[in-house]
Amino acid sequence: ANDIRPLRDFEDEEAQEFHQAAVQAFFLYVAVAFVAHLPV
């Protein structure tokens, strides 16, 4: 009856890794967009 873990445990484990990956992808996207808009 305890199939679902508390949300706090989920955030402490999977969400932390996902957050790191999302932040890295976001900054990579921003860097690519910034470079793409620089005058050549």
UniProtKB/Swiss-Prot annotation:
InterPro entries xref list: Antenna_beta_dom_sf (IPR023624), Light-harvesting_complex (IPR035889)
Binding-site list for a bacteriochlorophyll: 19, 37
Gene Ontology terms: cellular component: light-harvesting complex; plasma membrane
Stretches in topological domain Cytoplasmic: 1-20
Bilayer topology term: Single-pass type II membrane protein
Subcellular location: Cell inner membrane
Residue ranges crossing the lipid bilayer per the database entry: 21-40
Principal location class: membrane
Record's keyword terms, sorted: Antenna complex, Bacteriochlorophyll, Cell inner membrane, Cell membrane, Chlorophyll, Chromophore, Light-harvesting polypeptide, Magnesium, Membrane, Metal-binding, Transmembrane, Transmembrane helix
Gene Ontology molecular function: bacteriochlorophyll binding; metal ion binding
Coiled coil: none
Known function: Antenna complexes are light-harvesting systems, which transfer the excitation energy to the reaction centers.
Assembly behavior: The core complex is formed by different alpha and beta chains, binding bacteriochlorophyll molecules, and arranged most probably in tetrameric structures disposed around the reaction center. The non-pigmented gamma chains may constitute additional components.
Family (UniProt): Belongs to the antenna complex beta subunit family.
Protein name in the entry: Light-harvesting protein B800/830/1020 beta-1 chain
